[in-house]
Regions:
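Residue-level signal for inorganic ion chemistry
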Residues: 6, 59, 98, 158, ...
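N-terminal Rossmann-like or analogous alpha/beta NTP/dinucleotide-binding catalytic cores
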Residues: 36-124
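A non-catalytic, amphipathic alpha-helix used as a structural packing/dimerization or gating element
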Residues: 54, 157-164, 264-275
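N-terminal catalytic cores of NTP/NDP-binding nucleotidyl/phosphoryl-transfer enzymes
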Residues: 1-38, 42-46, 51
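Glycine-rich, Lys/Arg-enriched anion-binding loops that position phosphate/diphosphate groups
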Residues: 118-218
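A short acidic, helix-capping loop that chelates divalent metal ions and anchors anionic groups
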Residues: 36-42, 140-141, 257-258
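Phosphate/ribose-recognition catalytic cores of enzymes acting on nucleotide-derived substrates
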Residues: 175-278
Length: 278
């Protein structure tokens, strides 16, 4: 049930992989897609920290053999806790063990919890291990803390809790060419509409091994209203149109704003680029 793939999830994955290897079994990470919140509250703001592809890459790198995706639809939402364990986990998937957090609930109406999973699982040969929260000096490590940090533009905290920089991905598409006209051609990403949007502003980061000065926001200098992600890759030449670009966000340099003139804008972009190189 690993949506954010952060330090707590990595701790769970490490334990699962260790148990699986000791038992000579494959280690599988599991996740629901879409997030159950999306099913029960479809109008809630999007908050996904990782895409399915990102999760798969991260857990494979950690040593998992595969990722299991439960499609959270009406059928799964109406599956009783007993059927989830017996019919799905044991009979259909043949699992011999599961590891969850102590706050894990499942089944129709959240009818199952870790006690139900442990007792009913044991009766059907499924060993359930429950792990407590992972904490640091700021409290329990959770996806909510990471979201709050990103919404505040606090990349350092997000990076520490994720154990990696927060990443946005998107296909490079044609934009207004304003950056090119100013001498700073940008890769304009079509962002995942379901992903969390960090605080608008100018960021330092990296893409394709190049330092990046990136703008996330609505481009107020040009009177924009739609969210954009524009990345200037330092010392890069080439055509990225149609490519999928992965952009790491290292630091929020400043808020986005409009300028009195194009000259002022160019001067600020140059300063942002210099800061991104530091």
């Amino acid at each position: 049930n690993c949506y954010g793939s952060h330090l707590r999830h990595q701790t769970f994955a490490g334990e699962a992989i260790a148990q699986a290897k000791a038992a000579g079994k494959p280690a599988i990470s599991a996740t629901f897609d879409p997030h159950p919140v999306r099913f029960f509250a479809p109008d809630a703001p999007w908050f996904r920290l990782t895409t399915l592809d990102q999760r798969q890459r991260l857990f494979e790198a950690a040593g998992a053999d595969a990722m299991l995706v439960f499609e959270f639809d009406a059928s799964l939402a109406n599956t009783t806790a007993e059927d989830f364990i017996v019919a799905l986990l044991v009979e259909r998937l043949g699992l011999s063990g599961v590891i969850t957090g102590e706050d894990f609930t499942f089944g129709k109406g959240r009818g199952g919890n870790v006690d139900v999973l442990r007792d009913l699982g044991a009766a059907h040969g499924l060993r359930a291990t429950t792990m407590g929260p992972v904490k640091d000096e700021g409290g329990v490590i959770s996806s909510s803390r990471i979201r709050d940090a990103l919404k505040a533009g606090d990349c350092a905290t997000a990076t520490r809790l994720l154990t990696r920089p927060f990443t946005v991905e998107g296909v490079v598409q044609h934009g207004d060419k304003n950056g090119r006209l100013l001498g700073f051609p940008t890769a304009n990403l079509a962002p995942d509409p379901h992903a969390l949007v960090p605080a608008f502003g100018i960021y330092a980061g990296e893409a394709l091994g190049h330092r990046v000065a990136a703008s996330i926001g609505v481009n107020p200098h040009y009177g924009g209203s739609e969210r954009r992600i524009e990345a200037f890759l330092l010392d890069f030449t080439g055509d990225l149109y149609g490519d999928r670009l992965r952009l790491e966000l290292w630091e929020r340099l400043r808020e986005e704003r409009a300028f009195a003139s194009e000259d002022d804008l160019v001067a600020q972009i140059a300063a942002d680029v210099e800061a991104a190189q530091a």
